[in-house]
Amino acid sequence: NKPSLSIVNPLDVLRQRLLLEIARRQMKENTRQVELNRAILKNV
């Protein structure tokens, strides 16, 4: 039997938030990189 969801390990929550934040930053970085590459290709 799993404990109810109301009992959440604070550390788990923190880790989840951290992972989400990292993933979001990487996505932002990737889109920026793609845009840079596109601009470079356009100028060639």
UniProtKB/Swiss-Prot annotation:
<comment type="function">
    <text>Regulation of fluid secretion. Stimulates primary urine secretion by Malpighian tubules and causes a dose-dependent stimulation of cAMP levels in the tubules. May act as clearance peptide in that it may remove metabolic waste from the hemolymph.</text>
</comment>
<dbReference type="InterPro" id="IPR018446">
    <property type="entry name" value="Corticotropin-releasing_fac_CS"/>
</dbReference>
<keyword id="KW-0372">Hormone</keyword>
<dbReference type="GO" id="GO:0005179">
    <property type="term" value="F:hormone activity"/>
</dbReference>
<dbReference type="Pfam" id="PF00473">
    <property type="entry name" value="CRF"/>
</dbReference>
<dbReference type="GO" id="GO:0005576">
    <property type="term" value="C:extracellular region"/>
</dbReference>
<dbReference type="InterPro" id="IPR000187">
    <property type="entry name" value="CRF"/>
</dbReference>
<protein>
    <recommendedName>
        <fullName>Diuretic hormone</fullName>
    </recommendedName>
</protein>
<keyword id="KW-0027">Amidation</keyword>
<comment type="similarity">
    <text>Belongs to the sauvagine/corticotropin-releasing factor/urotensin I family.</text>
</comment>
<keyword id="KW-0964">Secreted</keyword>
<feature type="modified residue" description="Valine amide">
    <location>
        <position position="44"/>
    </location>
</feature>
